[in-house]
Curated annotation (Swiss-Prot):
Subcellular location: Secreted
Site feature location: Transition state stabilizer: R61
GO BP: hydrogen peroxide catabolic process; response to oxidative stress
Predominant localisation class: secreted
Job of this protein: Removal of H(2)O(2), oxidation of toxic reductants, biosynthesis and degradation of lignin, suberization, auxin catabolism, response to environmental stresses such as wounding, pathogen attack and oxidative stress. These functions might be dependent on each isozyme/isoform in each plant tissue.
GO MF, one example: heme binding
Protein name, as recorded: Peroxidase 16
Organism field: Arabidopsis thaliana
Gene from which the chain derives: PER16
Entry keywords, A to Z: Calcium, Disulfide bond, Heme, Hydrogen peroxide, Iron, Metal-binding, Oxidoreductase, Peroxidase, Secreted, Signal
Active site: H65 (proton acceptor)
Disulfide bonds: C34-C113, C67-C72, C119-C319, C198-C230
Signal peptide range in chain numbering: 1-23
Residues that, per the record, bind Ca(2+) 1: D66, V69, G71, D73, S75
Amino acid sequence: MKNQSSFSIVALLLIFFSSSVFAQLQTNFYRKSCPNVETIVRNAVRQKFQQTFVTAPATLRLFFHDCFVRGCDASILLASPSEKDHPDDKSLAGDGFDTVAKAKQALDRDPNCRNKVSCADILALATRDVVVLTGGPNYPVELGRRDGRLSTVASVQHSLPQPSFKLDQLNTMFARHGLSQTDMIALSGAHTIGFAHCGKFSKRIYNFSPKRPIDPTLNIRYALQLRQMCPIRVDLRIAINMDPTSPNTFDNAYFKNLQKGMGLFTSDQVLFSDERSRSTVNSFASSEATFRQAFISAITKLGRVGVKTGNAGEIRRDCSRVN
């Protein structure tokens, strides 16, 4: 009985702590200190996006990687030695980092905003903006995060989903951050504007098993197309669009592709091949509105993961260095 009481107290404390942290995140957090923060960031992101489309997938992926390691505290942005030196982060495109840097520079040019907005919040805003720029849903971004002071290679180990993951592995990892299976599937939908390097999926098209060189869950025509784009013994760093039908548009085509066996990673295709998640894929494939609403909910929850607020952390003067 005593143990049960202790557990209940701990559980209540965790709920109270989580609620108090989330309560400190507000969409109008900078209304007095930097009232034009969203406009300034949006304009900087748009300018960067006009230079290269890679801005969009790079920024989205950067946000996800940041939040899944130590929480959404911009620790991924810190200079080496840091998280970005881990093999799972070395493929992060430089355009994502540059997007945040450009937005930070734009804010610092405004005397009212200089060193007032955290790099973590800049990344969260930039992520929303690239989603909108590619045709995705607009949504309010909760703000008030503080920047972390620690970033290590070791912290990335076993913290990010792998291309070979099956459903249970995906669910377990996302559940650690308070994200449901539906959240996980909705966030996977961001792959509609993503790209991947040949080395991340070559096993599926060349040596899946001794008897089956091609993964049987993979559409055979799609597999042969991938072989043409990723010839054997050629540079494994060649980048391939994860959505072969509308790679530059944030839509629900990703889920329609899964129905056809055209998920690039095992972790993509398993969302349809596993009957436990198939109905959600079918729902998102049949209704873009349903997907968009689920994505808004999921990315809002993602943006709350492990946030530092109040007096925790700092507001970095340089996003790549602690103060």
